[in-house]
Amino acid sequence: MTGARKKSDFLCCGLDIKSYLCPVKINKQEINPLKEYSNYNYFNNMNDKKLMNLAADNIRILAASMVEKANSGHPGGAMGGADFVNVLFSEFLVYDPENPAWEGRDRFFLDPGHMSPMLYSTLALAGKFTLDELKEFRQWGSPTPGHPERDIMRGIENTSGPLGQGHTFAVGAAIAAKFMKARFEEVMNQTIYAYISDGGIQEEISQGAGRIAGALGLDNLIMFYDANDIQLSTETKDVTIEDTAKKYEAWGWKVIKIDGNDADAIRGALNEAKAEAERPTLIIGHTVMGKGARKADGSSYEANCATHGAPLGGDAYVNTIKNLGGNPENPFTVFPEVAELYAKRAAELKSIMAEKYAVKAAWAKANPEKAAKLELFFSGKAPEVNWAAIEQKANVATRAASATVLSALATQVENMVDRKSVV
C-alpha cells in the first residue's frame, strides 16, 4: 500500500474511522490511536521485511561508498546501524518534510558522529541530501562533514562531538519536551530518539544523563544502543565487564534486548517503547560491525575492528558492494523499491501533518493566549531582562554569583529550564 491511508484502510481491523481517535484494546493492551498515529503500526501491515533489508543494504552501500570516495571515515558502524535508522525514518519518526523546523516534531539525536555516513545516507533517501552531496563527504566546505553539524532544515538536530555528549542532548530535549507538554498539551507531544554506541556508553558524561533521565521518568525518551562490541582496536570485552542492561535498569529505565539487524525486532521494540508510560527506554540492539562487508578474497569482513575507522579498500570494497546488491562502478544509486518506500513515508507524513495542524488549529482557537505564548517561545526573540535588579555581594563564590543570576532569570524568562548539581 502506498500513499495516505483511507477510511477503508482502518475498517479491515474492525475500526471505524470515527473510533480511531478513542483508546482501543488490541491484544489486551490499551492503545491510544492518536498517540500512535505517527506510524500506523497497530492498524496496517508493516513494510515487507525483504524490502526493509533492501533499504538497509542501500544505506550500507551509500555509507561505505562515501568513505571509500573520501578515502577517510568510518564505514563499519554505519553499516551495522543501517537497519535501525531505516525502520525509524521509514515508519516512526514524525516531522514535516515541508517545514523541518515545526516545533512539534520528533527529535533524533546521533551521538557517535563518526557514523555520519549512516545518517546522511538515510536523509538522502528522505530527500534532505542529494547523491552528489554524499559524494562530497569530508570535503572542505561540503554539507556532509565527517561529523554532522546541526542543520534543522536538513534533519540534523545536533552537532556530534565527543562521544557521550549526544546522550545529554537527548535527555535535555526530553526534559524540554516534558516542560512544553505541561504548558501546551497535545500540540507538544513528541518523542525524543537517540542513537548511542559502545563508545558513548563508556564515557562518564553518559552516566549522569542516564541517571537523571531515569529519576525523572522520561517516558518520551527512547535510546537505541548499537551494541556491536567492537571499538577502534579491540573488542569491548577487553576493556569492560559491566552489564549495561542492569546498569540502566538500576537507573529506572525500561530495557529491551533485540537483534539490532532485524527490522521486525526493531519495529517491535520501538512499538513497545512508545507504549511505555512511566520510564525512558533503552533498546539494546546487538548489531554486526560492517554488516555485509567482504574481504578481498570474498570471505566475511564482518565484526572486524579494521572496518571501524578506515575505508574498506580495493577488492574488499568491490566485493562488499556486490554482496549488498550494488554496482561498484555506480554505487551512488537509490534502488527503485527503496525510493518508493520513502515516497510512501513522505505521503504518510503529509497525512499525519494535516491531522497535526488541524489539532493545533483547534487548540489555538480554544486557547489563544497559550497559542501566542507557544509562538513566542519559538520566535527566537529574547525577553526583556531587568539586569539592574541583580545585586551581587562582594567576594562571593562564583557558584553563588551564578545562582544569583540564574534566580533572577528564572523569574523573568518563562521558557528557561534550570537545575544545578551539588559539587
Locate predicted features.
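Glycine-rich ThDP/TPP pyrophosphate-binding loop and its adjacent helix/strand module
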Residues: 97-98, 152-153, 158-342
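N-terminal leader/propeptide and maturation segments of large enzyme subunits in energy/redox metabolism
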Residues: 325-388
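Non-catalytic terminal/interface segments that mediate subunit docking, oligomerization
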Residues: 360-423
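Cofactor-binding active-site loop characterized by glycine-rich and histidine/acidic residues
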Residues: 80-216, 415-419, 423
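Cationic, amphipathic, low-complexity segments that mediate targeting or membrane/lipid association
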Residues: 1-5, 9
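N-terminal capping segment at the start of a domain
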Residues: 56-72, 225-228
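Short, positively charged and aromatic/hydrophobic N-terminal segments
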Residues: 10, 20-25, 34-42
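A short glycine/serine-rich beta->alpha loop
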Residues: 49-52, 66-75, 103-111, 153-164, ...
